[in-house]
Regions:
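Active-site-proximal beta-alpha core segment in soluble small-molecule metabolic enzymes
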Residues: 62-122
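A generic structural signal for short
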Residues: 36-37, 59-60, 79
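Acidic, low-complexity proline/glycine-rich segments
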Residues: 1-23
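Catalytic cores of large soluble enzymes that bind and process phosphate-bearing ligands
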Residues: 33-40, 63, 109
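Generic N-terminal amphipathic, Lys/Arg-enriched alpha-helix
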Residues: 17-36
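N-terminal glycine-rich anion-binding loops that anchor highly charged ligand groups
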Residues: 17-21, 40-71, 84
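Short linear motifs at secondary-structure transitions and domain/linker junctions
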Residues: 8-12, 59-60, 104-107
């Protein structure tokens, strides 16, 4: 499988938030779907930031928890020093959404994955 094909497949998986204006039945949601109350999410991000700041610590949340570049951007806007990604595919999604401070927490050992990484790095 060529790295160009794999790379294009990774970029095809991008998503944007959809603001629901009316309730939607769970059975009608496209899956997978991350459904949350944005104000509560923002409050939780700020609480984490404030708790760690009170201890003199910064934070670098792991995107594996939410797998969502939009949430990673909110965390960065709240003061995170960066975000972590377990796999290259997670890092590619974050990079292609405009994030730059990404720590890949697993080793990249194959030549094809290194080629993909080189294509997405600025």
């Amino acid at each position: 499988m060529s790295t160009d094909f794999v790379f294009s497949r990774l970029l095809d998986k991008q998503s944007e938030p959809i603001q629901l204006t009316a309730p939607v039945a769970v059975s009608e949601l496209p899956t997978p779907a991350l459904v949350l109350e944005r104000s509560i999410l923002q409050r939780n991000i700020e609480s984490m930031r404030d708790f760690l700041a009170a201890e003199g610590k910064g934070f670098r949340p792991h995107s594996k928890t939410h797998k969502c570049p939009v949430i990673a951007k909110l965390q960065m806007e709240a003061g995170a020093v960066g975000v972590c990604a377990t796999k290259l595919s997670e890092a590619v999604a974050l990079i292609s959404s405009g994030l730059t401070e990404i720590l890949i927490t697993s080793p990249i050992v194959s030549k094809s994955k290194l080629e993909i990484l080189n294509k997405v790095l600025p």
